[in-house]
């Protein structure tokens, strides 16, 4: 085990200061929230600068700063390139965001689209898929908080995980999507500056030649461009990233919240800004052998290398950068999943007659409950972050084609869309267990595509797009 790079006392001070700052900022921003539209969708009036920043910061998750180095450490060059291909999800979602805003100007969630477009059968399947993914991502973020604190300060995993979850739940609860988007803007600046600085120090202090020599001597397979598992991971991660964004209410809620004409530009800018970040964070993992670092768990390699390069003062800097990345994703996911539970489960199934004022109160309780459930599920650290995240790939990749065809083609029916998601998920999970985590999304996406193509060939009725405009119940 490695010696802690910063003292436990310093870590606690940083957490307290940042926690008070974010929670106070969330309270200040949330003072004028009066309606469910204000709380869930920031008044549907977010401009280009904040829109681009929140999309980019949300996608720079703790997984980008912890899992990208882990996958580079395991799969080499293709690991970091494969992870960076998740930017395609943001870039390809850009035209879809415009289409979503046009079709559903009064929409709340992605669940609204599936329910109206495909009917309740496909909607139920989609909700199960979406919640399984959301909980997987929430757990990975909570775990990442505990791993971060433990790696850099020696603070117990459970303490770190609890504190970071409490901070993010606190300011999301007080400020809603306004607080999420505003803090994302600040966190984006911290992340971009921090990642570039750490990458530059690694390049200057260790050097490409030394990194290449140590990796080729100790782990030559990481430099092999024909490494079979790494190639499968590359294509798997492309479809995983696309599925994550296309189906998740995190991104749909922003499409609804952004001002008219902003969504397409914002997602394109954020995708291009995000693209190099996993390459930089993955690159530092290749320096681990040259620095004599052999982490007990591969998902600890990123913080340990960065702390080694920058020393104790630098470790504080690393801590702040990764904490910002963690918070920028956790708050967004809490808010978006709460919206889905409130709008689709509570109003859609349990209490159809609920007023907007009542939903405003319910959504806050849902955020609190989600935070508590995530904390309980994070207590046993069951797997590595990479494996947990890719487990959800089988769920999300099955939704890609039903959503794409549903937005642009009027002939795909609900039975086929629901079957595509269900069969894709099941067969993807079988592939995850029988072959490996690096093929789950690829298999799921392929099965879903086949079912959707069969549906397009056999189904003759055409959907009336005006039903989405009217938001039929």
Question: What residue spans do the PLM features occupy?
Answer:
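Membrane-embedded helix-loop-helix hairpins and adjacent transmembrane boundary segments
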Residues: 1-473
């Amino acid at each position: 085990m490695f010696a802690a790079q910063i003292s436990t006392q310093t870590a606690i001070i940083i957490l307290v200061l940042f926690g008070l700052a974010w929670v106070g900022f969330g309270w200040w921003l949330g003072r004028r929230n009066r309606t469910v539209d204000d709380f869930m969708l920031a008044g549907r009036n977010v401009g280009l600068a904040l829109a681009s920043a929140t999309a980019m910061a949300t996608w720079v998750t703790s997984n980008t700063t912890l899992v990208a180095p882990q996958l580079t450490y395991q799969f080499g060059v293709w690991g970091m390139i494969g992870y960076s291909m998740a930017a395609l999800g943001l870039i390809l979602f850009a035209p879809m965001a415009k289409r979503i805003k046009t079709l559903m100007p009064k929409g709340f969630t992605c669940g609204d689209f599936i329910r109206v477009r495909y009917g309740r059968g496909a909607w139920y399947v989609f909700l199960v898929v979406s919640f399984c993914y959301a909980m997987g991502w929430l757990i990975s973020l909570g775990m990442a908080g505990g791993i971060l604190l433990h790696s850099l300060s020696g603070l117990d995993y459970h303490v770190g995980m609890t504190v970071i979850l409490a901070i993010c739940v606190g300011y999301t609860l007080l400020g809603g999507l306004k607080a999420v988007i505003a803090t994302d803007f600040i966190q984006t600046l911290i992340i971009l500056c921090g990642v570039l600085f750490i990458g530059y120090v690694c390049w200057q202090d260790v050097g490409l030649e030394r990194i290449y020599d140590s990796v080729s001597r100790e782990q030559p397979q990481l430099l092999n461009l024909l490494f079979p598992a790494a190639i499968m991971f590359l294509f798997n991660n492309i479809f995983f990233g696309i599925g994550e964004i296309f189906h998740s209410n995190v991104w749909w809620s922003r499409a609804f919240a952004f001002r008219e004409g902003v969504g397409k530009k914002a997602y394109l800018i954020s995708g291009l800004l995000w693209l190099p970040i996993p390459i930089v964070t993955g690159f530092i993992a290749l320096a681990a052998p040259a620095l004599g670092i052999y982490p007990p768990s591969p998902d600890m390699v990123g913080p340990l290398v960065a702390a080694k390069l920058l020393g104790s003062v630098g470790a504080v800097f690393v801590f702040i950068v990764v904490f910002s990345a963690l918070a920028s994703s956790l708050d967004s996911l809490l808010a978006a999943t709460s919206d889905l539970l409130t709008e689709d489960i509570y109003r859609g199934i349990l209490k159809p007659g609920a007023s907007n004022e009542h939903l405003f109160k319910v959504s806050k309780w849902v955020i609190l409950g989600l935070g508590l459930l995530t904390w309980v599920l994070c207590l046993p650290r069951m797997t590595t972050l990479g494996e947990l995240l890719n487990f959800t790939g089988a769920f999300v990749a099955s939704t890609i084609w039903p959503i794409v065809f549903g937005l642009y083609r009027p002939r795909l029916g609900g039975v086929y869309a629901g079957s595509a998601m269900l069969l894709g998920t099941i067969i993807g999970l079988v592939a995850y267990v029988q072959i490996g985590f690096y093929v789950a999304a690829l298999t799921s996406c392929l099965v879903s595509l086949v079912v959707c193509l069969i549906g397009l060939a056999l189904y003759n009725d055409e959907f009336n797009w005006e039903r989405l405009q009217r938001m039929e119940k």
